[in-house]
Amino acid sequence: MAKAKSVDATWSDMKAEIAKIDTRQLVSLLADLYRFSKENQAFLHARFAVVADPLDPYKRTIAECMYPDVYKNKPVQISKAKKAISDYSKAEGDSLGEAELMTFFVERGNAFTVNFGDIDEEFYDALNRMYRRAIEKILSLPEKQRDEFKERLKTIMTSSADIGWGFHDALCEDYYSAFPEDE
């Protein structure tokens, strides 16, 4: 009698099945996955570095989510913007690219609140957490790659001076803890 298939397949099950197919079938499978979603396309573009700027689709998503078109009634979508960063990390795992996307996330969110006013505590908490994550990622980079990011982080901090919810204070605390020489 044939062994019954498990209801919950695992990666090991999938890997065993994939190992049985030839190159042509594997390419066909990847083509199907590529056509299935924009996220898959961005993942494969980043993984195989086939586009000039693998960050571009992720930055577009972050920009649309963190600085939405308010005149078209588009909402801020923090979780979708964070997912774009996570998706890039899974596709590429490049610390420099991750630092860029994290910093860009905070830049777009900060620009949105500077231009459109007070948002809510959840929004500012998300920006503060991402600012901290960006600093941690930037500090893990080689020293010569940090300077541009440091300037961008400082610009975010200084431009937030008139924003409430403790946002500016938290940015200052995080920035000067990471870069005490600037205090």
Question: For each predicted feature, which ranges?
Answer:
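Structural recognition of alpha-solenoid helical scaffolds
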Residues: 25-26, 80, 102-105, 130, ...
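N-terminal intrinsically disordered, cationic/polar leader segments
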Residues: 98, 102, 119-122, 133, ...
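Eukaryote-biased recognition of C-terminal alpha-helical segments
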Residues: 128-183
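N-terminal interaction modules that seed assembly of large macromolecular complexes
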Residues: 4-70
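Long, charge-patterned amphipathic interaction tracts in eukaryotic proteins
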Residues: 40-117
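Alpha-helical membrane-embedding segments
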Residues: 115-121, 163
